[in-house]
Each structure stands twice: as C-alpha cells, then as structure tokens.
Amino acid sequence: MIYLPDTNVWSRYLRGRDEDLPLRARVEAALADCRLSAIALMELEYGAEKSPHVPAFRLRITRLKEIVPAVAPFGTVAAYHAGFVRAWLARLKPNAQPIGPYDALLAGHALSLGAVFVTGNTAEFSRVPGLAVEDWRAAVGRKLRE
C-alpha cells in the first residue's frame, strides 16, 4: 500500500512537538510505504522561504527528503485526476463546493498513484470521489473512506 501524506502531515512531522508524537510514530512506522508529493514538497519549500527561520526549516526539509523513499513526481495522469476533482467539486457535484487548487492537485496526485491520502483535513478530502483518506493524528490511524 502506498501512502501520500498531505502537507499538513509532513509539517507536523517536521515540527516534532509533543502533541505530534503519535503522528510522528505512525509516519515512521509506515515510512517505507510513504511518498512525498512534489506538490507537498513545493508547499513545504514555500513555507520555509517565508519563515523567519529559513536555514532551520531548510535543514528539516533536506532531512525529510533523505528519509522518505521517494519524491513522487506530478505527471500527466495526476494532472488529469486533479482537473477532474476540481471540476467535479466545483460544478458537477450537486450542491457544489469547490476545493482549493493545491488540495485538488494533492488529491489528484494520490488518485493517480492509487495511494491512501493521509491528512488532518478529512472534511475537505472525504468529498473527493474514489479517494481513500486516513487521519493519522491519533495514535492509531483511522480509516475514513475507501
């Protein structure tokens, strides 16, 4: 099984605060099956650059890239899925509520990989058709949708 953690998961993992220890343990237990989305990496890079502590954040991102088995590139299949997700949630679904552009990219990326999307933002991503979503903030991951 492949897991594609959301940017918020990687951010909390890198932060390493006490309240993030259960999440950190869960990520580390599944690290061999985790992929770092190129989209999530871009969001982490952006956060580092706008931080007042650029060198410290940069070091954390470098370490993350060293321990995650692969950075998953965003290709044409992911682009197709992301476009579908954004359009479907914006106008095709009854009572449409659009999804943010980066969230659409991440959801499309997970769909293209056949990955379980790991996020703390389950309300947003559980609306995506066909996307398996898990929340690892608790000590034991909670499967929300397949």
Report residues per predicted region.
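Short, well-structured N-terminal submotif of metal-dependent ribonuclease cores
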Residues: 1-37, 48-63, 142-145
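Acidic, PIN/NYN-like endoribonuclease modules and their adjacent C-terminal/linker elements
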Residues: 1, 107, 111-146
